[in-house]
Amino acid sequence: MDQFTDREVTAAVEEAARRRKYVAAHCHPPSSIARAAMLGVRTIEHATLIDESSAAAVKSAGAYVVPTTVIVRALLDDAKAGRLPSWMSAKLAEVSDQSLKGLEIMDRSGLKLGFGTDLLGHLHTHQTREFVIRREVQSAAAILRSATAVNAEILMEPHLGKIQPGCCADILIVDGDPLEDIGVLAQDGRSLSAIMKAGEFVKFSP
């Protein structure tokens, strides 16, 4: 984000709006987060070092944050297993702690949080772990809203993310109650007894 001038970011935001799209920006420090929000960026990705002031800027602008807490934990596991240089382990541990503090600030500030992971390659196996990491700070209901209704809002797709007349009937039927234990969604699909896509079952396990 910081390598772009205000005029460049504004031009990207305006051009995206003309195409009915939006701009997302990878931001870590508070100054970048606040600047992106004030310039019209719709989603702030990561926001690892967010503070109260930058959170207020995001809220005032009506922007969203996608915390991606799992990427740091997954990389930390890799470092501890010797798959990354040893010097990275301490740094990742520090960033992991900070990401949870940031999530607390976001939650307390009432920001609209999307759900994403930023995982690539072999780290894809950690995708659903985001649910249980965010449980350390957020309620199950808030996490579910992030993964459904808020993500649909971010994408400007009003027919997604909700179960109501006029919406796409894209529904997961879970063996368990995610409001009681969000961990049922972190089992790599093993807890899914049925999957419905546009009103048609594509998986059904009676």
Predicted regions: what is each one?
Residues 178-184:
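Short, Lys/Arg- and Gly-enriched loop/turn segments at beta-strand edges
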Residues 18, 84-87, 95-178, 194:
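His/Asp/Glu-enriched, well-ordered alpha-helical/loop segment
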Residues 184-193:
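Short, compositionally biased
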